[in-house]
Amino acid sequence: MRAMACVRRVRNFCIVAHIDHGKSTLADRLIERTRAVEERLQHAQMTDNMELERERGITIKSHAVCIPYTDAHGTEYVLNFVDTPGHADFAYEVSRAIAACEGALLVVDATQGVESQTISNLYLVLEHNLEIIPVINKIDLPTADVPRVLQQVEHDLGLDPASSVLISAKTGENVDALFDAIITRIPPPQGSGTAALQALVFDCHYDQYRGVVVHIRVFEGQVTSGMVIRFMSNGAEYRVEETGVFVFNLIAREALCAGDVGYLSANVKTVSDVQVGDTITDASCPCDTPRAGFRRVKPVVFSSVYPVDTDECEQLREALERLALNDASISWERDSSLALGHGFRCGFLGLLHLEVVQQRLEREFNQTVIFTAPQVQYYVFLKTGQRIVCDNPAHYPLEQEIAQVHEPYIRATIITPTEVLGAVMTLCIEKRAYQTAVNYLDQKRVELVYEMPLAEILFGFYDRLKSISHGYASFDYELIESKLTDLVKVDILINGKPVDALAQLCYRPHARRRAQAVCARLKEEISRQQFKIAIQGSIGGQIISRETVSPFRKDVLAKCYGGDITRKRKLLEKQKEGKKRMKMVGDVEIPQTAFLSVLKEASDA
């Protein structure tokens, strides 16, 4: 593989699909057929190199790979492909990968057919005018229904079914025909190797020894070791120490030229100098204009994160900063809690995104953290006429100051088998959804369109949908306008003192049930003390639920054998007074498991 391959023999493409349709398995077959990796080093799901991805069986990060390919005529090509996530929470990863490519393999499972995320990914690809190759995968399975899926490709996706390539990524059947389609149908990159350098930053990661390693797609010119580059958004300049391509490890190359996808290392230690979507150019001969960057995504789920050890707040900040390099969709700002100390208020693209960030902080950065219950952004209109945006219960105004509250709504698209249609509709009604459309796609599948509050899908909706449909229903959503709601703040009090980290904003008719569930869970987690512990849920000072943790009781009458009853009363009164004093000065320690259990309770509600 030459460092500066002729641009006409380069193909850049991404692999996109609904979750579990076989993207990563297809990536394995492409690598295997081109012998990009020695046979002894090959294993399943090679592009899923994160431990968390292997555990969950899903792709979380987009992974770029450079492989050589020689066609039947002996012509050598360089194929740069990106394996992308399939879950809706990681759609931003897909959009960034698409910006670095000229083509896309749209993979559809021959047993499942077209699903909601297939359609969403199609729209992303069409926005960037990429050449689309429909790939019908898993044709080796007995339950594969290729004619039905080809009909869906034409009817649901608007693509020519004759352009589809039928393969089995598992067995490798017909993969050679897919290579031919990639070479003949995906156009080579445009650009000149002699023009001024113009490279798009589409991802990056932090290396302990090299600093920030920047992932780039070169559109014009070339970048070589020793060149001084400039980040066009902030003017920061660095000398390039190494350039190269991705073949699972970083493989150094002399240069990257127009059309190449690779990386550069310039000993960048200031993390804030590198921004995904920025343009890199030659400091001595800069290009005229930067590339159009990525549309900044807005987080939809918010949660506060605190270190268990309050002295480790600065280490948590550094960890979030480095994590944000590799996950540009996360946002964060400083926050504080009376109960948990200093921390950060973080924004995520969904509940799965939140869970992944939590686990990455613990595994990759050795941070033991506590996450509060996730919330969405509410729009609060005060009686003074002021409008405020609130995603943190600690900042929610007093009820008497509020004129009205609006909450974000989504347009949810659910594709489900017809035999579970009734159960799916019942679930949606429970979640305050109202139906806007029903489309029967064929005899076995129906598409439901609902408008529903975003907050209702945060807790258990996706899991219940999969359970009801035995895994066959698919779900996708997009944000629409906000609508009027009846919102209240539920405070949790421990011995009369509110714990701000346990407060939640929720729909008024659900408030009592939520408060009772949280109090019951806390009762199980908080250790007994020498005094009684009252756990209460309240709305605006009104107690709506209560649980009590019984105290330990010392038998002060153990040494009284008979005798006057007044002696026993005196001992009991003395014990009672002592417990009162203990309660006045005693602080209840709330364990980390209690916060985690409340988060789980919210998910189950």
Swiss-Prot record:
Disulfide bonds: none
Reactions accelerated catalytically: GTP + H2O = GDP + phosphate + H(+)
Nucleotide-binding among keywords: yes
Cell compartment(s), UniProt: Cell inner membrane
Predominant location category: membrane
Top-level enzyme category: hydrolase
Transmembrane segments: none
Protein name: Elongation factor 4
Species this chain originates from: Treponema pallidum (strain Nichols)
